[in-house]
Swiss-Prot record:
This is Phosphoglycerate kinase. It is found in: Cytoplasm. Pathway: Carbohydrate degradation; glycolysis; pyruvate from D-glyceraldehyde 3-phosphate: step 2/5. It is an enzyme of class 2 (transferase). It comes from Carboxydothermus hydrogenoformans (strain ATCC BAA-161 / DSM 6008 / Z-2901). Gene3D superfamilies: Phosphoglycerate kinase, N-terminal domain. The gene is pgk. Keywords: ATP-binding, Cytoplasm, Glycolysis, Kinase, Nucleotide-binding, Transferase. GO terms for biological process: gluconeogenesis; glycolytic process. The keyword Transport does not apply.
Length: 394
């Protein structure tokens, strides 16, 4: 990575503004149901504390629409962060202003102050320069560790970097390193697995990957649109009619550039999406008119597995079927197992693919699980991420 990281700056005794992604799920009692994102930031926070920095930590949570809303307060996060760090975490009553500046000014080395939800201010998402300056006033160095928000040009992810030295935290560094290694310098064969419901969400990714990969495996609801483009009848399956021509063009482009593009040869069909509904596996040329394709079939899973096992680099984004309803999760789990077994450099992104890897119990065998859904998608599209661009070059 050609951007400076926290290793490249002296932080001892300095106030450091750390933008993290603590956008965690809460239940109706406002208890955190999954603290993965908080844990992901711990190495950066621990390192900065050990180096004697004074930490001012900032994050968004949910979509409070630019106003204070207790429902989106970071108080439950402060409590969990304190448990994980094993220290007291001071909770600021606000994001900016004299009281917060006073609390930041009183911090001692190794202490942590968590600001309230940055999205309580409409200026955050507008990347308002005056608001960014107020955030910058709290500290002397800006550390970005929120890869999950790096595709957003907001005040706390990008704007603040105009006023302070800006460097990457360990999580941000790791994300950039693995994603760019896979995309820009892959060991071959390079296999990409793209799934999810809609082609429209993944057009940019497919177009960018066609110039880089050796094999492209397509599953999930989006595969139906490609099958339709090949002239197959898809019954009641989800198809984006307005994208059928585009799917055809992408298949032609793959041929032109010598990429092996594989679609399902068989699918699991059912009359509707619900657990326990009778389902069966059929070839893609025999999808019943009254049923819908909801997962890749066993032959496809086996075929995809063979391609994945040959790979030296694998990038996977999006499930192979309606993963959240059994038995339509089998194709996705089979792919997860193959990726884990391949021994390839593997990068998995997107909520559902990450959940699949965890469900299959193989998370520890994946080289890198990306914490940023939208950000990793834009990275795969070849876009520049504002939250990365603003960091100081080495």
């Amino acid at each position: 990575m050609n951007k400076k990281s926290i290793r490249d700056v002296e932080v001892k005794g300095k106030k450091v503004f750390v933008r993290v992604d603590f956008n965690v799920p809460l239940n109706e009692n406002r208890e955190i149901t999954d603290d993965t994102r908080i844990r992901a930031a711990l190495p950066t926070l621990q390192y900065l504390r050990e180096q004697g920095a004074k930490l001012i930590v900032a994050s968004h949570l949910g979509r409070p629409k630019g106003q204070f809303n207790e429902k989106y307060s970071l108080k439950p996060v402060a409590k969990r962060l304190a448990e994980l760090l094993g220290i007291e975490v001071k909770m600021a009553p606000d994001v900016v202003g004299p009281e917060v500046e006073k609390m930041a000014g009183e911090l001692r080395p190794g202490e942590v102050l968590l600001l309230e939800n940055v999205r309580f201010y409409p200026e955050e998402e507008k990347n308002d320069p005056e608001f960014a300056r107020k955030l910058a006033r709290l500290a002397e160095i800006f550390v970005s560790d929120a890869f999950g928000a790096a595709h957003r040009a907001h005040a706390s992810t990008a704007g603040i970097a105009s006023y302070l030295p800006a460097v990457a935290g360990f999580l941000m560094e790791k994300e950039i390193n693995f994603l760019s290694r896979a995309l820009n310098n892959p060991e071959r064969p390079f296999v990409a697995i793209i799934g999810g419901a809609k082609v429209s969400d993944k057009i940019g990714v497919i177009e960018n990957l066609l110039g880089k990969v050796d094999v492209l495996l397509i599953g999930g609801g989006m595969a139906n649109t490609f099958l339709k483009a090949m002239g197959y009848e898809t019954g009641k399956s989800l198809v984006e009619e307005d994208k059928v021509n585009l799917a055809g063009e992408l298949m032609n482009k793959a041929k032109e550039v010598g990429v092996k593009l594989l679609l399902p040869s068989d699918v699991v069909v059912a009359p509707r999406i619900e657990a326990g509904v009778p389902s069966k596996i059929v070839a893609v040329d025999s999808i019943p008119a009254e049923e819908m394709a909801l997962d890749i079939g066993e032959k496809t899973a086996k075929h995809f597995r063979e391609e994945i096992l040959k790979a030296k680099t694998v990038v996977w984004n999006g499930p192979m079927g309606v993963f959240e309803v059994e038995p339509f999760d089998r194709g996705t789990v089979a792919v997860a197992e193959a990726v884990a077994e391949s021994g390839a450099l593997s990068v998995v992104g997107g909520g559902d693919s990450v959940a699949a890897v965890e469900k299959a119990g193989v998370a520890d065998k994946i080289t890198h699980i990306s914490t940023g859904g939208g950000a990793s998608l834009e990275f795969l599209e070849g876009k520049k991420l504002p939250g990365v661009e603003v960091l100081n070059d080495k």
